[in-house]
């Protein structure tokens, strides 16, 4: 079990956003989190990588990648985040360097030392997302879809057990968005779970997954797909 939440209350500041959340995610699962703007999708995802705190008196259990989030120490959060890949709607690439150096920076800052291993891993992830011919380009020279593919490559660098994608297609045209979700769906075949928030319901129908909906302060399981 990669995620195991039992009766968790989730707050944004002092405001209760989601109450009594029960949620599990398993290896290789594709999970959608849907709901209106402001319904709690992003808040839920932020708890996974400790961007939002959770409280022991407001939950029975909150575990991610075998770490107890109700008792995790600040110094242990970076190690937890290294076991997951995080993808944002606005890409968050470093614009002062090319694609290769963007990925190089991540590997060096997460403890990789051997230059040959670094080079091999960068080439592997760029090939995985179909961007191996773009490694010398700077972000501003790429389309939105290409930048998001690079962001996915970055998320894959440390061979994460799960990927957390917060509205990864929100700034993309429909065809490009389709290609990005197809790529994320394909990634689950390697055993990596993908948790993706979206309000693109046609995409949810096209690429099957387990669907949770944030609605009226609750997280509701609305569709189960055993192969997702």
What are these regions, as identified by a protein language model?
Residues 69-85, 189:
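ABC ATPase NBD coupling module
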Residues 163-166:
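Catalytic Walker B motif of ABC-type/P-loop ATPase nucleotide-binding domains
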Residues 174-176:
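Helix N-cap at the start of a conserved alpha-helix in ABC-type nucleotide-binding domains
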Residues 137-140, 158, 190:
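Conserved signature/switch motifs of ABC ATPase nucleotide-binding domains
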Residues 49:
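Helix-to-loop junction immediately C-terminal to a conserved catalytic motif
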Residues 138-142, 146-148:
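Conserved ABC ATPase signature
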Residues 97-105:
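Short coil-to-helix segment of the ABC ATPase nucleotide-binding domain corresponding to the Q-loop/switch region
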């Amino acid at each position: 079990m990669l995620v195991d939440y039992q009766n968790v209350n989730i707050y944004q500041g002092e405001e209760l956003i989601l109450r009594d959340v029960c949620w599990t995610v398993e290896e290789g699962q594709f999970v959608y989190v849907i709901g209106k703007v402001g319904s709690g999708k992003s808040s839920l995802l932020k708890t996974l990588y400790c961007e939002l705190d959770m409280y022991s008196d407001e939950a029975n259990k909150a575990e991610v990648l075998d770490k107890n989030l109700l008792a995790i120490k600040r110094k242990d959060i970076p190690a937890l985040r290294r076991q997951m890949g995080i993808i944002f709607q606005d890409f968050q690439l470093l614009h002062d360097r090319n694609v290769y150096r963007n990925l190089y920076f991540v590997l060096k800052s997460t403890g990789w030392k051997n230059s040959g291993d670094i080079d091999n891993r960068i080439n592997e992830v760029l090939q995985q997302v179909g961007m191996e011919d773009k490694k010398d380009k700077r972000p501003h020279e790429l389309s939105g879809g290409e930048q998001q593919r690079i962001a996915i490559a970055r998320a894959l660098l440390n061979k994460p057990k799960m990927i957390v994608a917060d509205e990864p297609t929100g700034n993309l045209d429909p065809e490009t968005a389709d290609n990005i979700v197809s790529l994320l769906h394909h990634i689950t075949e390697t055993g990596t779970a993908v948790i993706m928030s979206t309000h693109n319901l046609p995409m949810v129908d096209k690429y099957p997954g387990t669907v949770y909906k944030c609605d009226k302060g609750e997280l509701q399981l609305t569709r189960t797909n055993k192969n997702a």
